[in-house]
Design a protein with these regions (language model features):
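Short, C-terminally biased terminal segments at protein or domain edges
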Residues: 1-135
Length: 135
């Protein structure tokens, strides 16, 4: 929602170019992660959707940089968005590199109701704080 709110302030002439693309790429990150999460019984499909999310996150960073250069975003706002997307990219890279830690295998007895949040909180990714791992 943050990008939606920020792009509401962009000039009207950007509505059908930068604004649409910026919003689409940011929404697509979440949509691809959700789709991949539901496909984690199939490692190749899981990695494919996470890879799509990674590409969309990188595209969102590109739109952030372009909006900054056009003076549609302040440097502080652009830096905050970039930091958020770097964290997302870090987690995606971790999940893509080690899909076996995330996919459902029948021999592990994983439950279909196992939540993404519980899996991420147990992540070995260095960007996840120790306090989050304990939750």
């Amino acid at each position: 929602m943050l990008i939606y709110e920020l792009t509401n302030q962009f000039p009207k002439e950007e509505k059908f170019s930068m604004v649409d693309q910026f919003r689409r790429s940011s929404r697509s990150v979440a949509a691809n992660i959700a789709e991949g999460w539901r496909k984690r019984r199939y490692p190749a499909a899981f990695v494919c959707k996470l890879s799509d999310a990674e590409g969309e996150a990188a595209e969102t960073q590109t739109w952030t940089e372009l909006a900054l250069r056009c003076a549609y975003l302040s440097s502080e706002t652009a830096a905050d968005l970039d930091k958020r997307y770097e964290a997302i990219l870090g987690q995606l890279v971790n999940m893509i590199a080690r899909p076996e830690d995330w996919v459902i295998r029948e021999d592990r007895g994983a439950s279909r109701s196992e939540s993404l949040r519980s899996r991420i909180s147990a992540s070995p990714h260095p960007r996840v704080s120790a306090s989050r791992r304990q939750n």
